[in-house]
Regions:
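Alpha-solenoid helical repeat scaffolds
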Residues: 1-228
Length: 228
């Protein structure tokens, strides 16, 4: 920025580093300088891409300052297709943190889904919103739709089992975990979760011990298992 102060990209890089260092006022000043220079770029694609990154950094600064409405407003300015989905998901998260969960869900639902993968990403983002808001029953039901789109995905099924537990459906959780183990005998997280849920209930304690030992056998160094 000192050697070539009229080039926009170094200002954007400097702002990025300043945000990482929590030098927010300095980052904001760098972004203002970048924006002034970027708006003069003749290439529309380069200008748009640069401004998108600047808006994302502005949103990050506002979020660090707990100004969630301001952060959401910056994200709303992004219309770059490459960044649109991620930006809208962040917007939805900020709306939910402000107690506007229904608005957040509507925003996710309004996103275009040109492919089945897009639809899965939308549902996954909405499930995460509900999980963060502790709306476990709704999250569990929506996760069921996600599983239906990819019924052979054991990771999705495991997440559904965990949400079933949060929503108070202990028997469903057990059924789903046993289904995963039957389909993928080395899925150690399922052994661990099922073992501990049985132990917590004080039932089938011998099976619970065997399940946990099996989990450790498959993943001896997994800190999640050794800590649980």
């Amino acid at each position: 920025t000192k050697e070539k102060p009229d080039l926009p990209d170094p200002w954007l890089l400097q702002a990025t580093l300043q945000v990482q260092d929590n030098r927010l006022d300095a980052a904001q000043a760098s972004l203002q300088r970048f924006t002034a220079l970027a708006e003069q770029l003749p290439q529309e694609e380069a200008r748009k891409a640069g401004l998108t990154q600047a808006y994302l950094l502005h949103a990050q600064i506002a979020e660090k300052r707990q100004r969630f409405d301001e952060a959401e407003a910056w994200l709303a300015r992004i219309d770059n297709s490459d960044e649109l989905f991620g930006a809208q998901v962040r917007r939805a998260s900020l709306l939910a943190r402000q107690g506007r969960l229904s608005h957040a869900r509507a925003l996710i639902q309004s996103l275009p889904a040109a492919t089945p993968e897009d639809e899965r990403m939308k549902l996954s983002a909405e499930v995460q919103l509900l999980r963060n808001a502790q709306q476990y029953q709704d999250a569990y039901e929506l996760q069921g739709r996600l599983v239906a789109l990819a019924p052979q995905d054991n990771d999705l099924l495991y997440d559904q089992a965990m949400l079933a537990e949060k929503a108070g459906h202990q028997e469903v959780m057990e059924q789903l975990l046993r289904k995963i183990i039957a389909r993928q005998p080395d899925y150690h997280h399922a052994y661990n979760a099922l073992g501990y849920v049985l132990a917590d209930r004080g039932v089938q304690l011998e099976e619970a011990r065997q399940l946990i030992e099996k989990a450790l056998e498959y993943a001896p160094g997994d800190p999640y298992i050794t800590d649980s």
